[in-house]
């Protein structure tokens, strides 16, 4: 699987801390992130047995275009990754996040970081609630980073000492009057590029109880960036059928 490296790390746009479980929120979290997570479906999250989505990235200035499809079972930890290599041949890898220590090196070093990256983009409101280590602050009526208008600014910062892939990251979430994120600015805590990503949060769809922003347009270090999700669906407990996002 050494060929995986070329297309999993070719553009890990941004990566948050490692924790991706729904059991890490024993401590009381700030009301603002709890309410935000509930807006995106937190109260019914336990009904979801599997999630499927394709993370798509287009960076024209860097001539980078990629698509990564994930099927994730949050309760079991199983992840299936699908993409195509440089020759257009299909690649498929299945592993369990609870058994990473025994996984192949390419899975640990390339596939898993790509999964974390894409999953944070996909359901970041949940991570803001689950990640106890993150410091959360809020300010009312802040100017939007893209377009006109104002919104509540909720800043989620990961301390340097936390570890993970990129400690010190900050996510500035601009929350509109309906309680949904309308834009955000990502500040990387480490030296890797891009160091600043600013995009919209739009194209909202629901897959079962899950609310997802499927369209993110803006810039990465000042250059055009388009991140979007397709093929979004969930499989609910007790059912073998996929419920497509609408």
Where are each of the predicted segments found?
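Intrinsically disordered terminal and processing segments
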Residues: 28, 39-43, 72, 87-88, ...
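N-terminal mature ectodomain segment of secretory-pathway/periplasmic proteins
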Residues: 31-106, 134-142
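Gly/Pro-enriched, hydrophobic low-complexity segments
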Residues: 148-244
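Edge/loop elements at the starts and ends of beta-strands within beta-rich repeat scaffolds
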Residues: 44-48, 147, 210
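Flexible, processing/modification-adjacent segments and terminal tails
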Residues: 27-34, 95-169, 189-193, 245-246
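Bacterial N-terminal signal peptides
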Residues: 10-21
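Bacterial N-terminal signal peptides that target proteins for export
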Residues: 1-12
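Sec/Tat signal peptide C-region and signal peptidase I cleavage site
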Residues: 22-26
């Amino acid at each position: 699987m050494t060929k995986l490296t070329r297309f999993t790390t070719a553009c890990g746009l941004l990566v948050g801390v490692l924790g991706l479980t729904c059991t890490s929120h024993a401590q009381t979290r700030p009301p603002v992130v709890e309410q935000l997570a509930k807006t995106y479906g937190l109260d019914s999250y336990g009904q979801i047995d599997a999630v499927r989505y394709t993370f798509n990235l287009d960076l024209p200035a860097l001539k980078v275009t990629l698509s990564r499809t994930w099927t994730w079972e949050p309760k079991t930890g199983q992840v299936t990754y699908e993409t195509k290599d440089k020759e257009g041949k299909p690649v498929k890898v299945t592993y369990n996040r609870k058994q990473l220590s025994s996984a192949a090196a390419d899975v640990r070093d390339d596939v898993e970081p790509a999964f974390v990256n894409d999953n944070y983009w996909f359901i970041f409101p949940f991570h803001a609630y689950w990640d106890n280590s993150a410091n959360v602050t809020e300010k009312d009526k802040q100017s939007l980073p893209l377009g006109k208008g104002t919104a509540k600014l909720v800043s989620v910062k990961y301390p340097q000492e936390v570890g993970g892939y990129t400690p010190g990251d900050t996510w500035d979430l601009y929350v509109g009057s309906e309680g949904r994120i309308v834009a955000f600015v990502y500040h990387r805590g480490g030296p890797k590029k891009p160091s600043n990503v600013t995009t919209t949060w739009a194209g909202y769809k629901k897959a079962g109880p899950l609310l997802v922003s499927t369209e993110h347009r803006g810039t990465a270090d000042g250059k055009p960036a388009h991140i979007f999700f397709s093929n979004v669906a969930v499989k609910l407990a007790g059912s073998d059928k996929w419920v497509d996002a609408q």
